[in-house]
């Protein structure tokens, strides 16, 4: 049995168990219920093919979702991440898979045209941003468009939900919401990474 004694021993036990479980699944046809991410890996993901949202145990705890944090921080971090992932269901990629997981463009030509009209300015706006690690380089707004849409939409959805839940939130709590969101994706890029 696993215990606190040996990390290597615990990894071997877990790996053996995982292999045994994989062998049992062969031929059972339950692949649609699988998600190949370990619970200890912080991940929140929308499965486009099966129209479902997954959250691992690791993402359901601090720093993303901390029950000791104020509601503003929970909405700003976890709520915005959920909104980000759900946006993928109806975004530029999501319109090629319907609610039953069938491939096909379910948008009308008018919807597709309106989407392009509404997302064009967002692409242009992001193209004007420079990388902090390499100010001479600009973001490729067309290349990052899907993620930018999901980020902006996720924050808007979480903000609307927070305002509905806490209509009289203080200025400090409103700021806490946005600080929590900015903390979710914080990272420092080297000039080499920024140029990739």
Predicted stretch roles:
Residues 1-196:
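Intrinsically disordered, low-complexity linker/terminal regions across diverse proteins
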């Amino acid at each position: 049995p696993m215990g606190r004694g040996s990390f290597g021993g615990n990894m071997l036990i877990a790996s053996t168990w995982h292999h045994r479980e994989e062998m049992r699944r062969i031929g059972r046809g339950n692949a649609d219920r699988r998600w190949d991410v370990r619970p200890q890996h912080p991940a929140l993901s929308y499965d486009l093919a099966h129209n479902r949202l997954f959250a691992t145990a690791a993402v359901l705890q601090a720093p993303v979702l901390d029950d000791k944090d104020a509601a503003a921080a929970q909405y700003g971090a976890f709520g915005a991440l959920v909104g980000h992932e759900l946006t993928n269901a109806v975004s530029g990629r999501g319109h090629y898979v319907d609610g039953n997981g069938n491939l096909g463009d379910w948008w009308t030509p008018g919807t597709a045209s309106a989407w392009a009209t509404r997302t064009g300015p967002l692409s242009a706006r992001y193209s004007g941003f420079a990388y902090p690690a390499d100010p001479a380089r600009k973001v490729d707004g067309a290349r990052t468009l899907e993620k930018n849409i999901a980020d902006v939409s996720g924050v808007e959805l979480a903000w609307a939900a927070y305002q509905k839940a806490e209509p009289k939130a203080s200025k400090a709590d409103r700021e806490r919401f946005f600080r929590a969101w900015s903390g979710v994706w914080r990272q420092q890029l080297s000039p080499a990474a920024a140029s990739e």
